[in-house]
A protein has these predicted regions:
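Short, hydrophobic beta-strand segments
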Residues: 103-109, 304-310, 354-359
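Short, internal active-site loops enriched in acidic
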Residues: 109-110, 141-145, 290-295, 344-350
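Short Gly/Ser/Thr- and Asp/Glu-enriched loop/turn motifs at secondary-structure junctions
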Residues: 98-102, 139-142, 280-284, 335-339
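DNA-contacting surface of Y-family translesion DNA polymerases
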Residues: 181, 189-336, 352
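Short, well-ordered strand-loop elements centered on a beta-strand within folded domains, enriched
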Residues: 36-38, 160-162, 298-303, 352-355
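Gly/Gly-Pro- and Ser/Thr-rich, intrinsically disordered tail segments characteristic of DNA damage-repair
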Residues: 1-225, 235, 362-420
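C-terminal hydrophobic structural anchor segments
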Residues: 324-381, 386-387
Length: 420
């Protein structure tokens, strides 16, 4: 069986773990640059605040003292996520980390009657050791585990753990699950199904397989089968990323090539680090730059370009150099740029790289690889302690507005809580 562990309102829960005075109060967490709402407490949901709501629309609630707001603190969230995942890894034979706040525990080999007890103990242990509340859904397939998790989270009577382990439970749960809430269907596919009378997950599985294939394609058939208890979604732990993107919106418009070079070099360097961390390399490096689409009073420009490498690369020097070549292809003066990003794609295993017959740069490439490894080692002690000249120093402001950011309670000596 699968047990899906989902941290409840994760970003908000991280803030509350070190600020207990926020318990019971409406809280939202904002995106980069304090742009819009990306996480909500149950209390703020009850106020009608939607995901993606621009901050300026709810700022008056903050000023009236009716809402607490926090800027995104990804260092804190990442550290608490790692702590939660380490506890799960101790309890599960196999663990697949799905996102920063979700993970599947593959419980095959564990006696079915023991699984609910193990999961109930985990809910208590994680809350006690990290301060993070979690919900766990248990079922034979990943999609049904998602359904079970929804019930565990929504209904307090489950005490954080819901098990769907019989046909009777499956049918009852699916009848209560709107089609738009089904993993693999979502809000894009739901209107199409609702228009032909498929309102719930139970309505969906009652349709013939060929009908589902015609409406939703092979992906829909997988979901249809999973909802009936047949495993179709495989373990994705060993799958490598097909592409990696690092991008950011700027708090101030960028207008000159020198400043944009610093930004793009940073993004490309981060992509290279992720490639090396995954043990992969990339054939293609792309860059996009964008003006502010919401500023009708300014000229608009949304170009992108990519550079194809003869030999796949993951060294910071090569990836940054390719990204800057792409940047020079698209950058134009006279525009005010709000956002930029770097994407590496056509990714292969690093140890499977084959050089070309006339590759005369292999010696330089080997040197770059050695330098990148040294950079990775040194930079474990601090951000950008060792960097390229085109990258920004570690103390340089990243240009992100964080007006309401909390402290780095778990990763910085100077931000540790004091007990008096």
């Amino acid at each position: 069986m699968y047990a899906l562990v989902d941290c409840n309102n994760f970003f908000v829960s991280c803030e509350r773990a070190f600020q207990p005075e926020l318990e019971g109060r409406p809280v939202v967490v904002l995106s980069n640059n304090d742009g819009c709402v990306v996480a909500r407490s149950n209390e703020s949901k009850a106020m009608g605040i939607k995901m993606g709501t621009p901050f300026f629309k709810v700022r008056y609630l903050v000023e009236q003292g009716r809402l607490v707001v926090r800027s995104s603190n990804y260092t804190l969230y990442g550290d608490l996520s790692a702590r939660v995942m380490s506890l799960l890894a101790e309890a599960a034979p196999r663990l697949e980390v799905y996102s920063i706040d979700e993970a599947y525990m593959d419980m095959d080999g564990v006696a079915p009657e023991r699984i609910p007890g193990i999961c109930s103990a985990l809910v208590t242990r994680i809350r006690r050791w990290t301060g993070i509340p979690v919900s766990i859904g248990i079922a034979d397939t990943k999609t049904l585990a998602k359904v079970a998790n929804h019930f565990a989270k929504k209904y307090k009577g489950y005490r954080g753990v819901c098990v769907i382990d019989s046909e009777e439970k499956i049918l009852k749960a699916l009848a209560l699950t709107p089609i738009k809430e089904v993993w693999g269907i979502g809000r894009r596919g739901a209107p199409k199904l609702e228009s032909v009378g498929v309102k719930t997950a139970l309505d969906f599985i009652k349709r013939p397989c060929e009908w589902v294939r015609g409406m939703m394609g092979i992906g829909g058939v997988r979901t249809w089968s999973e909802l009936q208890g047949r495993r179709m979604v495989e373990d994705e732990r060993d799958e490598k990323r097909k592409s990696i993107c690092t991008s950011r919106s700027f708090d101030k418009m960028v207008t000159d090539i020198d400043e944009m070079t610093l930004r793009v070099s940073d993004f490309a360097g981060k992509c290279a680090e992720k490639l090396r961390s995954d043990g992969t390399a990339s054939y293609s490096v792309g860059v996009f730059i964008q003006t502010n689409r919401f500023r009708d009073d300014l000229p608009q420009y949304f170009p992108n370009a990519s550079v194809r490498l003869d030999v796949p690369a993951n060294s910071t020097q090569e990836v940054v150099a390719a990204a800057l070549r792409a940047l020079r292809m698209v950058f134009r003066n006279g525009f005010e740029y709000k956002r930029a990003g770097v994407t590496v794609s056509d990714i292969v295993e690093a140890d499977a790289i084959q050089t070309t017959l006339f590759d005369f740069d292999q010696e330089a490439r080997d040197r770059d690889d050695r330098i990148s490894k040294v950079m990775d080692l040194v930079n474990t002690s601090g951000k950008n302690l060792l960097r390229l000249a085109t990258q920004r120093p570690g103390h340089y402001s990243d240009g992100i507005r964080r007006e309401f950011c909390s402290r780095l309670y778990s990763t910085s000596w100077s931000d540790l809580l004091e007990i008096k």
